[in-house]
Amino acid sequence: MVKYVLASAPAKVILFGEHSVVYGKPAIASAIELRTYVRAQFNDSGNIKIEAHDIKTPGLIVSFSEDKIYFETDYGKAAEVLSYVRYAIELALEESDKRVGIDVSITSQIPVGAGLGSSAAVAVATIGAVSRLLGLELSKEEIAKLGHKVELLVQGASSGIDPTVSAVGGFLYYKQGKFEPLPFMELPIVVGYTGSTGSTKELVAMVRKRYEEMPELVEPILEAMGKLVDKAKEIILSKLDEEEKLTKLGELMNINHGLLDALGVSTKKLGELVYAARTAGAIGAKLTGAGGGGCMYALAPGRQREVATAIKIAGGIPMITRVSREGLRIEEVSR
């Protein structure tokens, strides 16, 4: 019998195409090597207990049974963390048709609310750990679908990009609900976190308002973004050498950031981090995600440390990382 399972799932960045994807245009996303780790084991109480560490809700401990929830510690984000994890556990239990007590412990390298897919990563890692504990052998694609279901249950709407990238890993081209894996490329990147977050809902609504008020100006921007994503896909699929690919992708990143800025979703701080990264030698830098705060990322072959230092000096929180070939990973199974 399995004693416990430790699973991990990565964060993601939208490489190209945020906001325009809402209007039916494509996007390219990738998993990055910042991970959430979930350990699952059985308990004798028949209840489910969740402990979360290092995810901006330090020391959070929550227990719940069929009809009661026990907040053993009082933190504002408790319900937010609980909702993704609880639904993930519930869906895994439904798949196994079992009702048992489970302890889940979570640690994470991914900042919450930064636009890096922390919610999807914790859902995917939880489903991965709990399903394996219960003896299920779900494919990554099946786990991605369950992760998407968790997001729909919690958020009411979801494209499925975040849980799919987190479960499957690598590069994914997304358009109108369909995913296409792209060949893997090593991207030496630095993520810069502003320390603040923007509301995706509000930012999407703001772009929608501008689109409705000035379609003749906004539509060409969105159209250019869509063409840019397809150009990036063309470069990734091309037979150019790696250095040429990186240079061209960096150029597209800079253009994409300018288009996002034109839509009004960048901020002074994001701009400062983007330009600090470029000045320090990044060949491309742009915001990633909804904007209004959150994160930017820089492509910095051979210059990651220098770019990270520049981001820190500019007031950001740098994270040196790389694209993750793997998505969900079962780290350990103890019997």
UniProtKB/Swiss-Prot annotation:
HAMAP family: Mevalonate_kinase (MF_00217). One of its GO terms (cellular component) is cytosol. It comes from the Archaea. This is Mevalonate kinase. ATP binds at residues 111-121. Its main location: cytoplasm. Pathway: Isoprenoid biosynthesis; isopentenyl diphosphate biosynthesis via mevalonate pathway; isopentenyl diphosphate from (R)-mevalonate: step 1/3. Keywords: ATP-binding, Cytoplasm, Isoprene biosynthesis, Kinase, Lipid biosynthesis, Lipid metabolism, Magnesium, Nucleotide-binding, Transferase. One of its GO terms (biological process) is isopentenyl diphosphate biosynthetic process, mevalonate pathway. It catalyses: (R)-mevalonate + ATP = (R)-5-phosphomevalonate + ADP + H(+). The keyword Protein biosynthesis does not apply. Its cofactor is Mg(2+). Belongs to the GHMP kinase family. Mevalonate kinase subfamily. The active site is at 162 (proton acceptor). The keyword Cytoplasm applies. It is found in: Cytoplasm. GO terms for molecular function: ATP binding; magnesium ion binding; mevalonate kinase activity. Its EC number is 2.7.1.36. It comes from Pyrococcus horikoshii (strain ATCC 700860 / DSM 12428 / JCM 9974 / NBRC 100139 / OT-3). Catalyzes the phosphorylation of (R)-mevalonate (MVA) to (R)-mevalonate 5-phosphate (MVAP). Functions in the mevalonate (MVA) pathway leading to isopentenyl diphosphate (IPP), a key precursor for the biosynthesis of isoprenoid compounds such as archaeal membrane lipids. Pfam families: GHMP_kinases_C, GHMP_kinases_N. Homodimer.
